[in-house]
């Protein structure tokens, strides 16, 4: 039986967006995907492209008319479209600003005018900037350390203003180092987990930025899907018009990540256990440590992450081994 609720997922051909599309289609929602395929991939959509409840709009959030077309008849927006990556933003701050701020504002305006019920958007842990306090608590942020971090913080400011001024319900999800199936291992700005997995599978030595003691709150994709669903469906009025950390709530050093990857990949190829890693300089704009408090999400949204970092990593490794070999 088809669900009559219609969801727009911007950036729906990307890593997180395509996983959201697949999940909500499995729940019989009507799903519209808006993507310009600058970083997303059509192969991420193959599994459900013929689903009668799925509609693809090839467009760009930098064009207001594309946004207006995409939100027609939509109940909820899950806004994932953005140019990610701190290094990319340092190399090209103008395009990052155009997509992440101007594009975001276009989506807010289009959603407001179409009377969308709720606008859930991908915020970022980079907003915490130079704040050294751990764990990260939503109301206590530092100064941004990169153009990317600035754009994601401005998103939060715009969302807050649209909530207060126009009555548009918004919820921001500060993603912490999301990983899992469909995450692209290729390209100059590939995330660390798929990049390391691919290098190990090719029997290459991964290059670790710094001494490997930097730590991250790595978050499996299914926890992110869970948070998007909770944000979309909550009827708790205290839970809307705010931001939430979206993570597991534990941190893992890069050295430990390497250890786990070698252990899990060795189940498929024992020789991977003997591959050494190379250590290089720290990366500009990177924060040393990231650990998230998920207390607020638990209290207001009922969030209890289904996957630990290690259980999620095992699932991700299985997927990569099956799909990248």
Where are these regions (language model features)?
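Hydrophobic alpha-helix immediately C-terminal to the catalytic Tyr-X-X-X-Lys motif of short-chain
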Residues: 154, 158, 162, 192, ...
